[in-house]
Design a protein with these regions (language model features):
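A C-terminal functional module that forms or caps the active site or interfaces directly
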Residues: 172-223
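Proline-aspartate-enriched helix->loop->beta-strand connector
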Residues: 71-74
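His/Asp/Glu-rich mid-to-C-terminal helical/loop segments that flank catalytic regions of hydrolases
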Residues: 225-254
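N-terminal short beta-loop-beta anion/metal-coordinating cradle
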Residues: 1-63
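A short small-residue
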Residues: 118-120, 220-229
Length: 254
């Protein structure tokens, strides 16, 4: 990591990275099967990479961005499933807290969560989550003021077209694709999470070790319930483009 290094731009799947159509690529390097694109986004130098799905891939790629490429910060751009029933497909969540919901100890038929790296045993810290720095949060809020992030068509709502809303909140990370309304309700109730994905908290664990700022931006492609396996492919491209608009603006202040 270098204070004057480029931004690291991460995505999990091709559609999430392709949504950044203003990305100018100058050269490429392949490491560990991942293609790192060196170039610019707007006025900022950056290294962009499609890291793959899940926590292990995300942690590996984040480490390479910070150690091999000297990135000063990481932006994660992508889609997620919604947990908060008040949110809709196309809404955007900027994570001000990232929680790994599937790490911990199985006790009495339930998972008791612990922070990754902490032994999941009695007597050890039970504090969980990675919080967005408050001063960076305010910079992001100011930068996003007045930004038109678009929306999704009537097919996403079953009625009228929906103008995307931008929300700061808790995002949950785990190695599952959630297609279960009951579990969605439990996770929302237990953790206060408003969106769920498969990489963010793993990247946060790495970023914390390096002392690097991280901002995770997720547009909702589905609502993590019984229809998510159909909604995800249907609204993936539109949601990825919405997230990319937000990330482009945040790149000016991180």
């Amino acid at each position: 990591m270098r204070a004057d290094g480029p931004i690291g731009l991460m995505a999990a799947i091709p559609q999430e990275l392709a949504a950044h159509d203003d990305l100018v690529v100058r050269t490429e390097r392949e490491i560990a099967g991942c293609r790192f694109r060196l170039g610019r986004l707007g006025t900022r130098d950056l290294v962009a990479v499609e890291g793959g799905i899940g926590k292990s891939h995300a942690a590996m790629v984040a480490t390479l961005l910070l150690q091999e490429f000297g990135c000063s910060s990481i932006l994660f751009s992508g889609v997620a499933g919604g947990l908060d029933p008040d949110l809709a497909i196309g809404d955007v969540v900027v994570a001000d807290r990232l929680v790994m919901h599937d790490y911990g100890a199985r006790v009495g038929g339930r998972l008791k969560p612990y922070q990754p790296g902490v032994p999941p045993l009695p007597g050890f810290s039970e504090e969980i989550g990675y919080d967005l720095d408050q001063s960076l949060r305010e910079k992001i809020r100011d930068a996003l003021e007045g930004l038109d992030i678009g929306g999704v068509g009537a097919a996403a709502t079953g009625g009228e077209p929906h103008r995307s809303r931008l929300i700061f909140g808790t995002v949950l990370t785990g190695d599952i694709f959630l297609n279960d309304a009951q579990e969605r309700e439990r996770l929302h109730r237990t953790f206060g999470g408003i969106a769920i994905e498969m990489e963010g908290a793993a990247v946060a664990a790495v970023a914390e070790c390096f002392g690097a700022p991280l901002v995770v931006v997720r547009a909702l492609s589905d609502l993590a319930g019984t229809e998510s396996h159909m909604d995800f492919p249907a609204f993936l491209d539109a949601a990825a483009r919405i997230a990319a608009r937000v990330v482009g603006r945040i790149s000016t202040v991180i």
